[in-house]
Structures are given as structure tokens and as C-alpha cells.
Amino acid sequence: MPSAANTATVTAAIATTVAASASNTNNNSVSKEKRSSIISLGGSVIPGTAVAAGAGVATTNGQSNSSAAATADGSQTDLASSNNNGNAAKSKANAVSAAAVVPEPYNPLKQLLVTIEHKIRNLEKRKTKLESYRAIQSSGKELSGDQASAVAKYDAVLANLEFARELAKHIQQQSKEAEKEQKKQARKDNLAKTIAETAKIREVLIIQNVLNCFNDDQVRSDFLNGENGAKKLENTELELLEKFFIETQTRRPETADDVSFIATAQKSAELFYSTINARPKSFGEVSFEKLRSLFQQIQDSGYLDKYYLVPLAENAVANSTDSGTGSGDGESGDLLNDGSGELDAELPSEPSARNSLEEGLDKLHLGVQAELDQHQSYQQQQERPSHLLEPQHQRAPSLEHQQNSMVQQVSTQVYQAAPQAGGTTTPVHVLYAPAPPAQQQPQQPPPHPHQLLSSPVNLQALQTGTAAPPAQQQQPHPTHFAPNVRAVEQNYFKQPPQHPQGPGIQAPQTPQQQQFMQHSRPLAEVLGTGRFHFLQDSELDNPEALAPPPPTNQGLVFEQQPQQPNHVEEPTQAILTLTFTNQSFPSQQPQPQQQGPQQQQQLFSPVLIHEQRQQPPQQQPQPMLIMPRLPTQQPQQPAPQGIGMQAGDVTSGFSYENAVVSYEQQIQQQLKQQQQQQQQQQQNLQQLDEPSSVNSSSSVGAGGDVENNEWHARNNDTNAAATAALTNVLKGETTQATPPAPPTKWSSEMNAMSSAASNGSSNTSHKQEWATPRDHSTGGGNSGYADNNESNNHWNNSQGDGRRNSGNYQRRGGDRDNRDRDQGGRGDERRNGGDRGNYRSRQYGNSSNTNGRNSGNSSGVYFRNNESGNGGGNNYYQNGGGGGGTYNKESRYESSGGGGGSYRGQRGGNQQRNVNGSYGGGRPMGDRGRGGAGNQGGGGGGYINRQNQSQRMPLGLENKN
């Protein structure tokens, strides 16, 4: 009995479990149907189609009988049908709850486990009831028949309960393991499904690409003929492919009658699905299976791959674009062919284009290299000793090299001369170098008897009488100075190796020179149309053709040096600016003395005044050949008046070529004869200089210091002689009545370099400083570099104008408005003994004063005046000379000399210039020594010392005046 009761209990439990399972199944079915109804919301039936999105699902809802009759409008749903049945509220609630519950996958083990658990619970209840019966029975009460039979089954209930628990435990374990396996299998299935789907999509894309490729006529032709590795196809097969291509195209409707895009897409999808799945359904005359096989054969042939690879290498890339985007027009093949032809034509042209570009670059580099080679050749020519003069535009110094030359002393210097303003200027470049072996000088017209070989100025203007100021006046380089002075100048104005430049282009200059450039135009305007013209060797007159020399004064001897082997070449291109290099003139033995007027006219002058134009042509001297002097060729000079220095003695202070014969000695001997003439000329010049007083600031205007009476020591400086000659010429032009008597002899560099201590002249510094034009206007006659005041010109020693002031290098403007002359002999008028700022005072003590006039004030020694008893002496370095306190505190060396400013006085000051009416700006070349006197009194604002010791006269010049 008990066992039967237990069995019944277990059976009832199982039945209950099954009923629960059935109930769950029904619930799940209902929930699925409800979810289907929710999903069907918004589903629309596409007109003309039997199946709409979600319509088929909606019809499964058993609660909606009307859903089967869905109208063509596609707006009906199962939910609406339910509303029609009066169950809208309930259906909606059930649908929402069903949507919220996510159904789990059905697991039978779980269902079985649940059933067993329920049975176990029932067995436990029955066990409890039976235990109660047993307790009643044990208490002595009598049980009913049913109760007694139930208590008899107590042991069976316990056995069933234990069995159920064991079964539930094992089922639970199996269920967990089954779940794990299911998950793994699900992942595998998903992966396989993904691969399968990807393969299908890939196959669809392959089919589309094949169809697009067949739009190319060339491709179709190759497949029809079986060429180029293509599989041979029949026309029927091609027609089949074309049909499939047309039917699988998806198009947007263009009119209301057109099929919708969704319908065409659905049809295309079905065709692709049938093809990729190789369904046996027929398509045209063949099945989809055969159609799929046809596409596979075309792909496996590899023709299409080759077709794309070849165009990339040989043809235009456009071919691949056409075949990849197939428009269905069947024209992409032609485009590809055309593109390939064009590409073939273009590819060969690319190397030629590159070659052309490379050739152009090579030519450019060759041109640059040629210029560099030419530039190097010019530098080599400058460095070699041969004295070949090259065109100025090739020799024009560059700014960088000029700056570099500030640090380096270049032995080879290029002499650049002022260009002639009008016509084709023919600059003469004198390349100065150590004495080379004598060379035959090029054939030249007979030069003037007194040619300044080292003078860069072409005096053809003197012959033509049209000497006009340079059209564009550049800062004058201090032109060729005596060897000793050159070193000093180079320290201040470094002259770099000349580099070729365009014709007519002057190289950039040093800052002092550039400063002068700023004021060059006013100077040019003052000078008028005066011009420098440089003659080539062929244009120069031979000495034989010149007029006979004037009678020489007693004791005045000329020593002629042999022609220098330098060659002068004249470029045909105009030089825009007047340039004087800071080079010393190589000493030269002058030709036998010619007539005084001619000699003075031929003497070198950095600035030619318009007065030369006024001079009649017959008085114009013939051009002088300006050549670099060679120290070796200088003859021994008589009675040295310099400081123990010989003409070629480089150790005299600076290692340079021989000093230039100074014109001073000639003047000294001629002074007495010419004093009356010079006085008369001076008066004439004063009248003429007033209009050109500004010219006192001539581009090379050197303060009286340039004229320091070092001329005994500086006799070798041809620059001094040339300047004096030019000023004499100017004087001669202006005062044609009394031509200055030419010096009979160039006391060659021996005199300048002579070591005679008695003269005390610092011959060592044979440097003709060309004062910057701004210095030109020193107060006294000394002021202007180019002052016409013969006395101001330290060249003017012998000039007949009687300018006593040799102070100015060449004061063309004669004391700016003749103020120097008019103001009590401040400038040029100062007679001997005045503080003539000698560019190179010959005397330390005035001992070399030939006339004894300058003994008092005149000696401004170029180097040291300390020894000179002269009060006014200016020393190049230390103006220890007595006389006024030097204005040049800024000078390189302090000049304690009286009037004399030190060689390098303040450079920038306008004071001296302004006093004299000079430009007024800072000195272009730098006011080298502003005259110790400040240029106020004396004209001595010299190139080196613009000392206003206008009264300082070169010893020789003093006598001249």
C-alpha cells in the first residue's frame, strides 16, 4: 500500500510538471504571436507584390481573422485587427509584456529538472503528513483504514524522495555542461554562418564585376575569340550574361509608372541568391546552377586580372577605372585603349623633358661656373706680378672684399680712376704690384713729357678742355700713395682684391667712402660738367710728340725712370663714379721738364675743375700715362730730404713700393721764380674758385694735412706731383697769363725716402691722403682736397698761382668762395711760415724748409712732428709738434701738434667742413684728421689731418708760395 501511494504521488507530480510545461508552451506561443503583431506594426504591403514586409508574420496571429484579408494599402496591422475584434486593450497589454520578456532558448534538461524538483517537493510534503500519522498511531490512537495504509507507505515515500534528489542533482550537472556546449556550438555556427554569408557576398561582388567588365568591347571580343587568355564563350552565353546584367540592375523610378526601387532590389537579390546558391531553378534557357558555373569559369580564367595588370604598367590607369565602374555603355574598352596610346606617347616624352631640364640646369651651372672661373682669374691676375691693367668694371672692388681688406693688406692694388661723365668713359686701371721684370709697354701715342705713370686719372680732358666733374662721383679711394703711406691707408681703407663687375658699375665702397657717396651729387653739381676721361695706352701721346720742356731752373733736375712694364687697358663702358683707390702712386722718373704750364696741367689731380674746360685747347696738356711705379727702377735720388728712408725702402714704415718723386722739389726751386706769377694766379683763382668753392670738397678733398710739408720726404709721391700739376693746370687755365713754372726735376723717391734727419721729414709715410670730399672744405686754403688753391694743393708747391697754402690736397674750390684767400691768408694766402698743414711735413724741425719760410709753423710731420720745432707741425701719428692743440682728439694718435691735427683725426665731424662751407655731412671718407685748427683758421683739414693749420705749408710748397 505505501508503495502504491508513493507511486501515485510521483505520478501526480510528473503530471503536474507536464501540465506546467504545457502551460508554459502555450504562454510562449501566445507571446510569440503577440511579438509578431508588434513587429508587424508599420509593415506595409508594396503594391503589386504578394508579400509585404511583415505581412506574412502578421497573418500568423490567430486572434486576428481580418489580418488575412490585409488590403493593398499596406497600412493594416494585426494590432488594428485586434481592435476590430474588441480586444484592443488586452492585446496591447499582452504585446507589451511579451516584448519586455526575452525568450530563452528551450532547454529540455531544464524542463526535466524543474519537474523533478516539483516531485521532490511533493514527496517532502507527503513524508511530513505520514510522519504525523505515525505520531498519532504511536500515541495509542487508532487510525482509519486510509491513514493506516498511508502510514504503511512511509518508507516508499522516503525512497522516492531520495531518488528524486539524486536525479535532480545529476540533471542539473548535465544541464550546465549542455549549456556550455551549446554556447560553443553557437559560436562555431555563427562563425560558419558569417563565412558563408561573406562568401556569398563576395560571390555577388565577383558576379557584378564580371558583368561590368563585359561592358568593355575589348573584353567581350577576347572572350568571344578566346584570345589573350580569355575563356572562349558562345554568343548565347554572352547574351545570357547580358540578360542577367540587365535584370539585376537596380534603378530608381523616374516616373510614377516605373517599378519601385525596393521591388527592383528585391528581384535582383533573389536572382543573386538563386545564382550563388546554384538553385536548379531555370533562368532563361539555363539553370542558375549553370549560370553560376559560367561566372566561375570567367573568374578562374584569370583574364580579367591580367587585363587590369597590363594597363597599370603599359596603359593609362583610366582603363581600370572604366572596367571597375562599368556604366553598361560598352565603351570603357575604347577609352582604355585610347588612354593607353596616349600614355605610351607621354612616357617617352618624360625622359626627354627631364633631360631638357637637366641640360638647362647644367647650362646654368656652367654659366655660374664660368663666372666663378672668371672671378678667380681676375683674382689671380691681381695677385700675379704682371702689371696688366684691366677694365674697371672687371676690377671694381666689391663691398665684401673691401671690408675684408680692412683686415688684410693687399700688395696688389687696383687703381681706379674717375670716369668721364660724358661719352664713353674709358677708365684706366693701374694694377700696382711689386716690380716685375721690365716689360715692353704697349705702343702709345707720345705721352706728355711728365706723365704720372701711377696716376689713375686720364687727363685727356685737359687736352680737350672739357674736363667736367664726374657724372656720378663716388667716394674717392685715396689714390696711389707713396709706399710708406700706402700701408697706413690700407690699415684704414683696406682695398680688397678687385672682382669683376658689370661695366659702369662701381664696386661698393667702405663706409667712409659710402658716406662720401651720399654727398657726391652736390659735389658733381658744384663741379659742373667736368669729367674725367681715361686714355688707353694707344690714346696717350708719346713723349717725343710733346712740346719741348720749359727751361729748367738751376738746380732742378729731372730723373726719368724707364717706362714701367704695366699695361693700361681702357674699357669702353662708362664708369658712373669717380673712384680713387687708397693706393700710393708708384714712383716714376718724370720726363724731362716740359713747359711749366703743361707740366702742371699734366700732373695728376683727382678732381678736374670746370676751369679746365675754360682753358683754351692749346693750353690743354697732353694726357699723362698713369702707370704703377716700380721701386726697382727708381734711380738714386740726390740729397735725401726724407727721414733715412730710401725710395724703395719698405722698412721705412710700411712694406710697399718705392715712394713717388714729389713735385715739391721742383716747386722749391721754382718758387722764387713763380712767386709773383702764383700770387697773380691766386687772385685769379679766388675769383674762379668762388663759383666752385664747393669744389673744395672735391671727391678726394684732402685737408691741409695731405699737403703736410712732407713733400721733401714725399717727393717720391707721384700723387702729390700729379695733384700739384693738375692744380697748376687749373691755375694755368684760370690764370692763363702766368703758367706755373714746372719743376725741373722729380726728386725721386730718394728725396722722399731720403734719410736725412736734418730734413726731419717723415718720408717713411709717403702717403698722399686723398681727403674725403667732405674734408675738402677746410677753412683755409688747405681745406679742399681738390681745392683749386694751388697753395692748398700739396701738389701745388710749384704752382704759379702763388697759393701759399699747400694745406689742401687740392682745393679746387679755393677756400670755398675764396674765403680762405680772403680771410687774412688763412688758407691758401698764408705765405710761407704759415701753419700750412703739410700732408707730410718734411721737417721735423723745418730744417728742410728750402726757403726757410715754413720753419716756424709749417712742419706737420706725417709721422712724428714731435721733433719739429715748428709749432704747427701735425704728426701723422703723434702730433707732438708745437702749435695749437690738435683738434683731432679722436685721431689714431693724439696730435699734440699746434695747428696740425694728427694723421687720423676725427673722421665724422662736420665742423671743419661746415666751417669751410663743405658739404656738411660727415666726411665721406671719414674726416681723417680734422685739421687741428678745426679747419676754422687754416685750410688744413687734410685727408689725414684736416688740420686747419691752413698756414702749414710743405717746405717745398712754402717756398713755392
From Swiss-Prot:
Residues 384-393, 766-777, 812-838 have a biased composition (Basic and acidic residues). Residues 61-79, 400-410 have a biased composition (Polar residues). The modification Phosphothreonine is found at residues 764, 778. Residues 109-188 form a coiled coil. InterPro entries: Caprin, Caprin-1_dimer. Its main location: other. Residues 60-89, 320-354, 373-410, 494-518, 541-568, 630-650, 678-711, 753-961 are annotated as: Disordered. One of its GO terms (molecular function) is RNA binding. Residues 869-886, 896-908, 931-943 have a biased composition (Gly residues). The modification Phosphoserine is found at residues 356, 758, 765, 777, 791, 798, 806. One of its GO terms (cellular component) is cytosol. Residues 80-89, 501-518, 630-641, 678-700, 753-765, 788-797, 845-868 have a biased composition (Low complexity). Keywords: Coiled coil, Lipid droplet, Phosphoprotein. It comes from the Eukaryota. It is found in: Lipid droplet. PANTHER family: CAPRIN HOMOLOG, GPI-ANCHORED PROTEIN P137. Belongs to the caprin family. This is Caprin homolog. It comes from Drosophila melanogaster.
